[in-house]
């Protein structure tokens, strides 16, 4: 199911400046081959998910929550080598 992408503009700007990643590009990750797990590391007061997928031939990891029929992006970063190896099991 295609859901719109939303995000906090200030977090977006910080991530774009520090990591060169644009939260708006999360739609490309969800449109391609990706895997999602529930983020149960602690109680956030809302459901959170961790998704790994491909963006311009590099693996990225997103943390997001469903909100108002959209995916609200909380964070986005490039996967580390060990992390990428773990996610590849799910992504094939």
Question: Which residues does each PLM region occupy?
Answer:
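Ribonuclease/tRNase effector modules and their secretory precursors
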Residues: 1-92
